[in-house]
């Protein structure tokens, strides 16, 4: 679902930071 994709994107942002 969009919620799952959003969660993965958020995690990627944290790792990138």
UniProtKB/Swiss-Prot annotation:
Family: Belongs to the Frog skin active peptide (FSAP) family. Septenin subfamily.
Subcellular location: Secreted
Cellular component aspect of the GO annotation: extracellular region
Entry comment describing in which tissues the protein is expressed: Expressed in skin granular glands.
Broad class of the protein's primary localization: secreted
Protein name: Septenin 1d
Species per Swiss-Prot/TrEMBL record: Osteopilus septentrionalis (Cuban treefrog)
Superkingdom to which the source organism belongs: Eukaryota
UniProt function note: May act as an antimicrobial peptide.
Lineage summary: Eukaryota, Metazoa, Chordata, Craniata, Vertebrata
Assigned keywords, A-Z: Secreted
């Amino acid at each position: 679902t969009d919620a799952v994709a959003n969660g993965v994107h958020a995690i990627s942002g944290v790792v990138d930071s």
